Amino acid sequence: MKHLVLASGNAGKLEELRAMLADLPLQIVAQGELGVDDVPETGLTFVENALIKARHASTVTGLPALADDSGLIVDALGGAPGLYSARYAGSPTDANANNAKLLEAMREIPAERRSARFYAVIVLLRHPEDPQPLIAEGSWEGVITTAPRGTGGFGYNPVFLDPVHGLTAAEMDTALKNRLSHRAVALATLQHKLHALSL
């Protein structure tokens, strides 16, 4: 496996994934660089959506493909925004609108009930018909702030606080965030599976 297509059109995700995969002996190519458009995410779970994206990119390019599907799960909101995190405030996706809607939904929720987690599923398809895709998941526990903090990252980063470090994901430097994040946990699990299979 010399080339790997990242099946995402999300610039923030692409930057994060490229940084996390930098040590692998692979040429990482974003799907857009190969003329692959985003595919509708019609799955009912994170795993289904990641598989849809990876299969689409692998089918179009003929290359192995890695896809992530992720979201923010807020306990007090019954798991919302969850699978619909990117489109929580409607389409087209708008991180500021999503954050504003989330903070409004959480306005009356006390501090002790503001628990949340980022959750990610990463899928690797070695070829379009791969019958045994490698699937890994990761989560990052935190709490929802009462106001945005920080300017780094993307998505819900300004409103997701890591209580251990006392920083939102948007306040962290890239190295710290890429060590703690749900995507980092999932990628570490995936890399372990790859080594176990000698890929």
Curated annotation (Swiss-Prot):
Catalytic function, reaction form: XTP + H2O = XMP + diphosphate + H(+); dITP + H2O = dIMP + diphosphate + H(+); ITP + H2O = IMP + diphosphate + H(+)
Cofactor: Mg(2+)
Domain of life the protein comes from: Bacteria
Cofactor note: Binds 1 Mg(2+) ion per subunit.
Residues the record lists as binding Mg(2+): 69
Gene Ontology MF terms: dITP diphosphatase activity; ITP diphosphatase activity; metal ion binding; nucleoside triphosphate diphosphatase activity; nucleotide binding; ribonucleoside triphosphate phosphatase activity; XTP diphosphatase activity
Keywords assigned by UniProt, alphabetized: Hydrolase, Magnesium, Metal-binding, Nucleotide metabolism, Nucleotide-binding
Pfam families: Ham1p_like (PF01725)
Active site residues of this protein: 69 (proton acceptor)
GO BP annotation list: nucleoside triphosphate catabolic process; nucleotide metabolic process; purine nucleoside triphosphate catabolic process
Stored InterPro entries: dITP/XTP_pyrophosphatase, ITPase-like_fam, RdgB/HAM1
Enzyme Commission numbers on file: 3.6.1.66
One GO cellular component, as annotated: cytoplasm
Residues the entry annotates as binding substrate: 8-13, 70, 154-157, 177, 182-183
Alphabetical list of SUPFAM superfamilies matching this protein: ITPase-like
Subunit structure comment from the entry: Homodimer.
Family the UniProt entry places it in: Belongs to the HAM1 NTPase family.
Annotated function: Pyrophosphatase that catalyzes the hydrolysis of nucleoside triphosphates to their monophosphate derivatives, with a high preference for the non-canonical purine nucleotides XTP (xanthosine triphosphate), dITP (deoxyinosine triphosphate) and ITP. Seems to function as a house-cleaning enzyme that removes non-canonical purine nucleotides from the nucleotide pool, thus preventing their incorporation into DNA/RNA and avoiding chromosomal lesions.
Entry protein name: dITP/XTP pyrophosphatase
Record organism: Xanthomonas campestris pv. campestris (strain ATCC 33913 / DSM 3586 / NCPPB 528 / LMG 568 / P 25)
